[in-house]
Amino acid sequence: MIPPLDVFSLKNDEPTWLGPAESLEKALEITRQNGIGSYLICSQRTGRKERYQVDANGTVRRTRGVQ
């Protein structure tokens, strides 16, 4: 079965695929592990895309929905 989420890092609004995730919790852990920056989490099931930001403290916040 294909994992339902894909995680991307965003640098200059260019996505780089970081890998799949089975849940939002696991997707957010991938973003934390990759450190400060902007990320995009995409649902394979719904097509929904959400942007997240990781700060210097390792806090992850949703910044805005893309679709």
Per-segment meaning from a language model:
Residues 4, 10-11, 32, 53-55:
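Intrinsically disordered, low-complexity peptide-like regions
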Residues 14-19, 48-50:
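Surface-exposed loop/edge segments in extracytoplasmic proteins
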